[in-house]
Amino acid sequence: MYNLARQLLFKLSPETSHELSLELIGAGGRLGLNAMLSKPPASLPVRVMGLDFPNPVGLAAGLDKNGEAIRGLSQLGFGFIEVGTVTPRPQPGNPKPRIFRLPEAEAIINRMGFNNHGVDALLARVEAARFKGVLGINIGKNFDTPVERADEDYLLCLDKVYHHASYVTVNVSSPNTPGLRSLQFGDSLKQLLDALRLRREDLEIMHGKRVPLAIKIAPDMTDEETALVGEAVFQAGMDAIIATNTTLGREGVAGLAHADEAGGLSGAPVRDKSTHTVKVLAQTLGGRLPIIAVGGITEGRHAAEKIEAGASLVQLYSGFIYKGPALIREAVDAIAALRSQAK
């Protein structure tokens, strides 16, 4: 059924089909249709960051930036949902067209630029959804906020989402906001992480609960840089690291239509680079900090490979667009099989 729907949706522009898909998933959630139309995955509980997940396969940020289909997406079988990236103020993002499909490679290039309705609009929808599962909220900075003052945007967002989020992801790795990736390195990273840690301490007292913080990183660093970032994230008292965001590289898509478009590449071509980043982080951290793996999961076995590389959880995005809800169940089953083999 999804294959037929995908054929119809793929006749539309990528952004139009994205918006229509979210509307349909949202409507299906309100009517309770999604749960009836999709076979739920087996229960595979896991505890990470002090949170209990019904299964380790989640939805990555970027698909539902504004929290418009939380209930509908949760009915498809995801073990957790991450919404955003959201910024303090609404912003339109980059000019259209800004999403490009490369179906031959099961890939997508996007240069969205953190288009979103703003943090207040997101939180209104989160409250309306009344979602009882694990909800991550991914936060970023506004386009016109200087990088030197980025911590102000992150702290403002953290203040607002803290009470509503199961965990908060700090996005310092999108390639589509100028200068953002510089926040992954050296003093800039330390300053941001220290500010987040101190603010979280205040919010924990204020709200009476400790909300985990995850840092999302890029796949385009050297092994040494990745190791340094991983160690810095651990030393700053963060709770997880998400690896990875999209890549600026074009390995695996050379010569394909749209391959030369500016933006971040996701999907199958980023799989190996993302998994390698997970391995480097796992070797560096030695189990001291959980890793959430995302990037290039288009088959169930790819999810198991991420877990084998050292991840505790995985997330889907491009693979979900190409393969549909069945991929969730495939990924859960593959991870369950891996666990059984390890016993």
From Swiss-Prot:
Catalytic function, reaction form: (S)-dihydroorotate + a quinone = orotate + a quinol
Coiled-coil segments: none
Binding site for FMN: A61, G62, L63, D64, K65, T85, N138, N171, K216, T244, G267, G296, Y317, S318
InterPro entries on file: Aldolase_TIM, DHO_dehydrogenase, Dihydroorotate_DH_1_2, Dihydroorotate_DH_2, Dihydroorotate_DH_cat, Dihydroorotate_DH_CS
Amino acids binding substrate: K65, N110, R111, M112, G113, F114, N171, N176, N245, T246
Associated pathway: Pyrimidine metabolism; UMP biosynthesis via de novo pathway; orotate from (S)-dihydroorotate (quinone route): step 1/1
Pfam families hit by this protein: DHO_dh
Enzyme Commission designation: 1.3.5.2
Free-text remark on how the cofactor is bound: Binds 1 FMN per subunit.
Places the protein is found: Cell membrane
Family the entry assigns: Belongs to the dihydroorotate dehydrogenase family. Type 2 subfamily.
PANTHER family recorded: DIHYDROOROTATE DEHYDROGENASE (QUINONE), MITOCHONDRIAL, DIHYDROOROTATE DEHYDROGENASE (QUINONE), MITOCHONDRIAL-RELATED
Protein name, UniProt field: Dihydroorotate dehydrogenase (quinone)
Annotated gene: pyrD
